[in-house]
Amino acid sequence: MILKKIKSLRKFFILIVSIILFSPVLFSANISSKHSLSILNSIGTRDRGLMNSAFLIPKDSSAVFINSSSLTTLIRDSINLNYTLTPNFKEEYLFNASYSHTDNVYAIGIGFASELSKIKTYNISRQKENDILSGNYLINLGAAYMINETSYIGGNIKAVINNFDNHNIFGGFLDLSYMQSIFNPALKIGIGIKNFGFYDKVFAAIDTDIITSIAYSKEDSSFAVALEYDISVPSVSHKISLGLEAMIIDFNKLGLFDSNIDYDDLPESVLDEPSHMQKRHLTKLPSGILGRLGIGNKGVSLGLSLYVDLFRFDYAIVFDNFNKNNISHDFGLSFMF
C-alpha cells in the first residue's frame, strides 16, 4: 500500500512538472516580454556564499525560498534573517526573513522578503523634489512531505506586490521540488520548478526556472559540495554554479562546546517519536567557523559562518557577473530551537 502511494505521488509530480515545463512555451506567442523579478530569487546569506548552489544542502529556514522539499531534512525549527548591502546601499534596502517547523513526516515554512528603492525626482527647473519610495514585497508559503527516509517532495505558493508611487502590481507563483538520497544519505539529487505563474495579469510574464542539482553533504556539517544547473524559460537563459563549504575551526573537536545529547537527557515526548525524529534531535550540532566558496557563470562569492550550537552568524561577499564595481555584502542570522 505504501509503495503504491509513493509511485502515485511520483507520477503526479512528473505530470505537474511536465505541464509546467511546456505551458510557458505553448503560451509564449501571446507574451510581449520576458523578464525576471529579483525578489522571487531571494535567498539566505549562506546560499549567497555558495553562489546560489544550496538547493540540496539547507541548514536553516531560508530553504523555503530555495527548495521547500529540503525543509524536512532540517534538524530543528528555525528562524533566519538576512540583509544585503548593495553597491547602491544608500538607495537600496534588501531584507528577508523566514521561519520553518519540521515535524514527523512534514515540514512547513513561511518567508517574507522586501526590496526598497529610493527614486530621486526633479521638477522642470531641475530642482530636487521629494524622493519616491518603490518597493517589491514577497510572501512565500512552503510545505514539504517526506515520502520515505530518502525521498522528499515540496511546494510553494508565492505572492508578489510591486508598489510604485501608490500604484500596485500583483503576481502569484507556484514552486515544486523533489529531492532524493542515492547510495547513501549524504549524496542527494533533486529537481525543481520555480516561479510558474502570472504577473500583472499576464501568464508566464516572468521566466519559469527549471533547476537540477547534485550535492554531497556530511551529516556533521563539516563539509559540503554542490553543483546546480538552472534554465529559465521561455527566455532560455542558463545558470550553473558550484559551491564548496568546509569547517575551518571545529569548536567541538577543541572541546569548547559540548553538543552531545544523551537519550537520558531527552523528554519522554521525544523518545516516543519515530526513529528519524530521534535522529534529528540527537544530531550533534556544529560549532565552529566555516568557509565557503561559490563560482558560476553569474559571478563568484566567498562566505564565512560562526556556528555556536543553536546560533549561526553568516557573512558573504558576492562579485556579481565578476564585476569589481558590482560587489554585494550579505549578513545573516539563524536561530534553531
Cite the ranges covered by each PLM segment.
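Bacterial N-terminal signal peptides
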Residues: 14-24
